[in-house]
Regions:
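Terminal C-lobe "cap" of eukaryotic-type protein kinase domains
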Residues: 144-166
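Activation segment signature within eukaryotic-like protein kinase domains
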Residues: 12-13
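Short conserved helix-turn element in protein kinase catalytic domains
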Residues: 99-107
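Activation segment/activation loop of eukaryotic-type protein kinase catalytic domains
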Residues: 41-71
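Conserved hydrophobic alpha-helix
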Residues: 16-23
């Protein structure tokens, strides 16, 4: 596996945050953010692939998923999806956070576990400050986002801006 430089990772993250901002502005959530769905073009620009689970989101209230379905890949699921409520913009941003942990070479404490309840508990209880400072800042920002709130995209982008010192 090729290791990416920090600048390249930050550039990828910025591109994906912008992709999600665009998807969200159209009233949709991706629902399956993970490293395997991040594609790079010849110039190294990142885009999101596999929109097969994408769905419209609601901002009216916290809605229980009547289908009792979990949308996405277990390792990267958001707390909302674990709780069986419909995914929102926050859900995508949290899933991106778990993806960013791995892009920066971190290990998710639940990686390889198969018990959904154990994974859900670990995600709720994980001390995000164990990760890279940028990743921790990002995850804290996501955790501060309300279920129906618009993510603070500009603040998230600033965390990974090129002129930010490592």
């Amino acid at each position: 596996m090729t290791t990416l430089k920090q600048d390249a990772i930050c550039s990828i993250v910025v591109n994906i945050i912008r992709c999600l901002q665009c998807i969200h502005s159209l009233g949709f959530v991706h629902c399956d953010i993970k490293p395997g769905n991040i594609l790079l073009d010849k110039e190294g620009n990142a885009v999101l692939g596999d929109l097969g689970l994408a769905r419209q989101y609601t901002t009216s209230r916290r809605l229980v998923d009547k289908n009792n379905k979990r949308y996405g890949t277990l390792t990267y699921l958001s707390g909302d999806v674990h709780a069986r409520v419909l995914p929102t913009r926050r859900s995508d941003m949290e899933s991106l956070g778990w993806t960013i942990v791995e892009l920066f070479g971190g290990k998710l404490p639940w990686r390889g576990l198969k018990y959904i309840n154990t994974i859900e508990t670990l995600k709720k209880e994980v001390d995000v400050t164990i990760f890279d400072d940028r990743v921790a800042s990002y995850l804290l920002l996501v955790r501060a986002t309300g279920y129906n709130d618009e993510p603070k995209y500009n603040e998230m982008l600033k965390i990974f801006a090129k002129d930010k010192p490592s």
